[in-house]
Structures are given as structure tokens and as C-alpha cells.
Amino acid sequence: MEAFSMAMFFLSLGQGVFSNVVRSRDAVRGNREVAIKIIRNNEIMHKTGLKELEILKRLNDADPEDKFHCLRLYRHFFHKKHLCLAFESLSMNLREVLKKYGKHVGINLMAVRSYTAQLLMALKLMRKCNIVHADIKPDNILVNESKSLLKLCDFGSASLVSENEITPYLVSRFYRYVFCFLHISFIT
């Protein structure tokens, strides 16, 4: 399985409609902990996974020094015909941070400023690469163990601006942008 052992898939981090994410160790990266997104093995999911891979490569290429806060793709491989994407492993998503550390009080203003600046850097990179994420929400924003570093993840719904058509179903219902309702271009 290309430097991964099934015994090394040691923790399920999440399950979704399109994929499962597990924590593992990557022998190719010095036994470093990684998160592996295992795309479901059917034609539609495989095609979507390949599109996500293309977008992640574009973002990585545009940010070789990893300064723009988009989750880093280390590599990809196939396991039992499943496309697998190996990423840097971060601690928890923003929803979990808010629930654990900000329940009933929110998080402090300095953290909000820092997170906002980092998220804006990710948006700046996506704009430079002509990419629309289309699913920005707390679940798709990861935070490191010390809660100082934030990265945007899950580019499974992302597309190039030139390929995009505004529809009411472009993003998750509760996080839908105003332009979706007004049918206004989101790139100006």
C-alpha cells in the first residue's frame, strides 16, 4: 500500500458521504503522522476526488512555502481502487474548538483576529488560483494542537471560477452566501 500499513490506520477522524478520513503514519515522510482521506470507490466519487486532487496540486504549487493556510497535500495513492489523499494532520476542526473552548462565551478576540487573518490568506491564495471553495464552514477549517494555526480543508466541492455556475445548492444550506440567493457573481 505504498509505505502505509493497514495496521497504521490507527484512528478514524471522520466519515462523510464522499469519503472517510483516518489518521496514520507515513513511512515515506519519516513515520510522520498524516490524515488520509479515502475517497469512496464509485465513478462519481472517484471523478470528484480526481478534481479535488487537481485543485490541491494547484494550491500547493502556488504556495510552495506553505504560507497561505490551505491544508497541505503530501501525496496521493490508490488502495484497493480507492483514491487516497495524504495530508498534514491537524488536531481538530473549528466547530470542535468553539464547542470545547468557547462554549457559552466564544473564543477570545485575539484568536478571532488571528483566525480571520489566516482564513483571509487562504482566500487570497484561492483567488490567485481562480478557485472557489464552495463549502467554507467551521467543519472545513482545521486548527493545530496549540490552537495557533488554522488551515482551510476539504476542497471536494471546489472548482475553478471558469467552471462554476451559481446554483442554490452550491454550498451547505446554513452557510450559503448571499450571492447564491441573489444570483450575483461572487468574483469581482
Where would I find each of the regions flagged by the language model?
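Conserved N-terminal boundary motif of the eukaryotic protein kinase catalytic domain
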Residues: E2-S12
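Protein kinase glycine-rich loop
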Residues: F10-G16, V21
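Glycine-rich ATP phosphate-binding loop
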Residues: N20-R40
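Conserved alphaE helix
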Residues: F68, K80-C84, S89-K147
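A short, aromatic-enriched beta-strand patch in the conserved N-lobe beta-sheet
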Residues: R75-H76
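Activation segment/activation loop of eukaryotic-type protein kinase catalytic domains
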Residues: L142-S172
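Conserved end of the kinase activation segment
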Residues: C180-T188
